[in-house]
Amino acid sequence: MARIDASKLELTEKVVYINRVAKVVKGGRRFSFSALVVVGDGNGHVGAGLGKAAEVPEAIRKGIEDAKKNMIKVPLNGTTITHQIQGRFGAGKVLMKPAAKGTGVIAGGPVRAILELAGVRDILTKSLGTNNANNMVNATMEGLKQLKTPEEVARLRGKTVEELLG
Protein backbone atom coordinates (compact mmCIF):
# COMPACT_ATOMS: atom_id res chain seq x y z
CA MET A 1 0.00 0.00 0.00
CA ALA A 2 1.30 3.47 -0.91
CA ARG A 3 2.24 5.75 1.95
CA ILE A 4 -0.19 8.64 2.51
CA ASP A 5 1.41 12.10 2.40
CA ALA A 6 0.10 13.79 5.56
CA SER A 7 1.40 17.23 4.52
CA LYS A 8 -1.22 17.45 1.73
CA LEU A 9 -4.13 16.73 4.11
CA GLU A 10 -5.92 19.08 6.50
CA LEU A 11 -5.59 17.04 9.68
CA THR A 12 -7.23 17.35 13.09
CA GLU A 13 -5.59 15.83 16.16
CA LYS A 14 -7.19 14.25 19.19
CA VAL A 15 -5.32 13.09 22.31
CA VAL A 16 -6.86 9.77 23.38
CA TYR A 17 -4.95 9.43 26.64
CA ILE A 18 -1.87 10.63 28.49
CA ASN A 19 -0.12 8.25 30.86
CA ARG A 20 2.51 9.06 33.48
CA VAL A 21 5.07 6.29 33.76
CA ALA A 22 7.82 5.91 36.35
CA LYS A 23 11.25 4.36 36.13
CA VAL A 24 12.59 3.43 39.55
CA VAL A 25 16.27 4.33 39.93
CA LYS A 26 18.66 4.36 42.88
CA GLY A 27 17.72 7.92 43.86
CA GLY A 28 13.94 7.49 43.57
CA ARG A 29 11.48 7.59 40.68
CA ARG A 30 12.01 9.17 37.26
CA PHE A 31 8.72 10.22 35.68
CA SER A 32 7.98 10.50 31.98
CA PHE A 33 4.82 10.70 29.91
CA SER A 34 3.33 8.75 27.03
CA ALA A 35 0.57 10.18 24.84
CA LEU A 36 -1.70 8.25 22.47
CA VAL A 37 -2.80 10.57 19.66
CA VAL A 38 -5.16 10.09 16.69
CA VAL A 39 -5.06 12.30 13.57
CA GLY A 40 -7.52 12.38 10.69
CA ASP A 41 -9.01 14.56 7.96
CA GLY A 42 -12.64 13.46 8.41
CA ASN A 43 -12.62 12.17 4.85
CA GLY A 44 -11.31 8.60 5.05
CA HIS A 45 -7.73 9.25 6.21
CA VAL A 46 -6.77 8.41 9.79
CA GLY A 47 -3.67 7.51 11.79
CA ALA A 48 -2.73 6.71 15.39
CA GLY A 49 0.57 7.21 17.15
CA LEU A 50 2.26 6.91 20.53
CA GLY A 51 4.71 9.53 21.76
CA LYS A 52 6.92 9.30 24.85
CA ALA A 53 8.85 12.15 26.47
CA ALA A 54 9.80 13.80 29.77
CA GLU A 55 7.19 16.55 29.23
CA VAL A 56 3.51 16.23 28.16
CA PRO A 57 3.58 18.69 25.18
CA GLU A 58 6.65 16.96 23.76
CA ALA A 59 5.00 13.53 24.14
CA ILE A 60 1.90 14.82 22.30
CA ARG A 61 4.06 16.31 19.51
CA LYS A 62 5.89 12.98 19.08
CA GLY A 63 2.54 11.15 19.11
CA ILE A 64 1.23 13.40 16.32
CA GLU A 65 4.39 12.78 14.24
CA ASP A 66 4.02 9.01 14.74
CA ALA A 67 0.32 9.14 13.83
CA LYS A 68 1.11 11.00 10.58
CA LYS A 69 3.57 8.24 9.66
CA ASN A 70 0.93 5.54 10.28
CA MET A 71 -1.91 6.96 8.16
CA ILE A 72 -4.39 4.63 6.44
CA LYS A 73 -7.19 5.16 3.90
CA VAL A 74 -10.61 3.95 5.09
CA PRO A 75 -13.04 2.98 2.28
CA LEU A 76 -16.35 4.62 3.17
CA ASN A 77 -19.81 3.82 1.83
CA GLY A 78 -21.46 7.22 2.23
CA THR A 79 -21.39 7.86 5.97
CA THR A 80 -20.62 4.30 7.11
CA ILE A 81 -18.15 1.46 6.47
CA THR A 82 -18.56 -0.98 3.57
CA HIS A 83 -19.02 -4.21 5.57
CA GLN A 84 -18.85 -5.76 9.05
CA ILE A 85 -15.33 -6.32 10.36
CA GLN A 86 -13.55 -7.35 13.55
CA GLY A 87 -10.15 -5.89 14.39
CA ARG A 88 -7.83 -7.62 16.85
CA PHE A 89 -4.71 -6.47 18.64
CA GLY A 90 -3.33 -8.10 21.76
CA ALA A 91 -6.30 -9.00 23.96
CA GLY A 92 -8.41 -6.23 22.41
CA LYS A 93 -11.12 -6.92 19.86
CA VAL A 94 -13.36 -4.34 18.20
CA LEU A 95 -16.45 -5.41 16.25
CA MET A 96 -17.61 -2.79 13.72
CA LYS A 97 -20.89 -2.96 11.80
CA PRO A 98 -22.23 -0.61 9.12
CA ALA A 99 -25.29 1.35 10.25
CA ALA A 100 -28.20 3.17 8.59
CA LYS A 101 -27.96 6.91 8.00
CA GLY A 102 -28.82 8.88 11.14
CA THR A 103 -27.62 6.20 13.59
CA GLY A 104 -24.54 8.15 14.67
CA VAL A 105 -21.24 6.82 16.02
CA ILE A 106 -22.05 4.23 18.66
CA ALA A 107 -18.60 3.60 20.09
CA GLY A 108 -16.71 4.03 23.32
CA GLY A 109 -13.75 6.31 24.06
CA PRO A 110 -10.67 5.43 21.98
CA VAL A 111 -12.66 3.72 19.20
CA ARG A 112 -14.95 6.77 18.83
CA ALA A 113 -11.95 9.11 18.41
CA ILE A 114 -10.61 7.11 15.45
CA LEU A 115 -13.97 6.67 13.72
CA GLU A 116 -14.91 10.35 14.02
CA LEU A 117 -11.56 11.52 12.65
CA ALA A 118 -11.80 8.95 9.82
CA GLY A 119 -15.08 10.56 8.73
CA VAL A 120 -17.41 7.70 9.70
CA ARG A 121 -20.77 9.21 10.76
CA ASP A 122 -22.93 6.07 11.21
CA ILE A 123 -21.53 2.87 12.76
CA LEU A 124 -22.24 0.30 15.47
CA THR A 125 -19.24 -0.97 17.45
CA LYS A 126 -18.61 -3.27 20.37
CA SER A 127 -15.31 -3.39 22.26
CA LEU A 128 -14.47 -6.90 23.46
CA GLY A 129 -11.64 -8.21 25.61
CA THR A 130 -9.35 -5.59 27.12
CA ASN A 131 -10.29 -1.97 27.65
CA ASN A 132 -6.67 -0.81 27.44
CA ALA A 133 -6.81 2.32 25.24
CA ASN A 134 -3.63 1.45 23.30
CA ASN A 135 -4.92 -2.03 22.38
CA MET A 136 -8.39 -0.68 21.50
CA VAL A 137 -6.90 1.95 19.16
CA ASN A 138 -4.62 -0.60 17.48
CA ALA A 139 -7.47 -3.14 17.16
CA THR A 140 -9.66 -0.47 15.52
CA MET A 141 -6.85 0.47 13.11
CA GLU A 142 -6.31 -3.23 12.23
CA GLY A 143 -10.02 -3.61 11.53
CA LEU A 144 -10.15 -0.50 9.33
CA LYS A 145 -7.10 -1.76 7.37
CA GLN A 146 -9.04 -4.95 6.49
CA LEU A 147 -11.98 -3.05 4.94
CA LYS A 148 -12.46 -3.49 1.20
CA THR A 149 -14.72 -1.72 -1.29
CA PRO A 150 -17.28 -3.81 -3.23
CA GLU A 151 -15.18 -3.14 -6.37
CA GLU A 152 -12.06 -4.65 -4.74
CA VAL A 153 -13.96 -7.76 -3.58
CA ALA A 154 -15.51 -8.22 -7.05
CA ARG A 155 -12.08 -7.91 -8.71
CA LEU A 156 -10.53 -10.43 -6.29
CA ARG A 157 -13.34 -12.94 -6.96
CA GLY A 158 -13.34 -12.34 -10.72
CA LYS A 159 -16.95 -11.14 -10.80
CA THR A 160 -18.77 -7.90 -11.50
CA VAL A 161 -20.12 -5.74 -8.68
CA GLU A 162 -23.68 -6.50 -9.87
CA GLU A 163 -23.07 -10.28 -9.60
CA LEU A 164 -21.61 -9.79 -6.14
CA LEU A 165 -24.45 -7.66 -4.76
CA GLY A 166 -27.15 -9.73 -6.46
Curated annotation (Swiss-Prot):
Which Gene3D superfamilies does the entry mention? 3.30.160.20, 3.30.230.10
PROSITE patterns the UniProt entry points to: RIBOSOMAL_S5, S5_DSRBD
Which GO molecular function annotation, any one, does this entry have? structural constituent of ribosome
Q: Which InterPro entries does this entry report, sorted A to Z?
A: Ribosomal_Su5_D2-typ_SF, Ribosomal_uS5, Ribosomal_uS5_bac-type, Ribosomal_uS5_C, Ribosomal_uS5_N, Ribosomal_uS5_N_CS, Ribsml_uS5_D2-typ_fold_subgr
Q: Where is the S5 DRBM domain positioned along the sequence?
A: 11-74
Quaternary structure and interacting proteins, as annotated: Part of the 30S ribosomal subunit. Contacts proteins S4 and S8.
UniProt free text on domains: The N-terminal domain interacts with the head of the 30S subunit; the C-terminal domain interacts with the body and contacts protein S4. The interaction surface between S4 and S5 is involved in control of translational fidelity.
Report the function annotation for this chain. With S4 and S12 plays an important role in translational accuracy.
Identification of the protein by name: Small ribosomal subunit protein uS5
Question: What organism is listed for this UniProt entry?
Answer: Desulforamulus reducens (strain ATCC BAA-1160 / DSM 100696 / MI-1) (Desulfotomaculum reducens)
Classification from the root reads: Bacteria, Bacillati, Bacillota, Clostridia, Eubacteriales
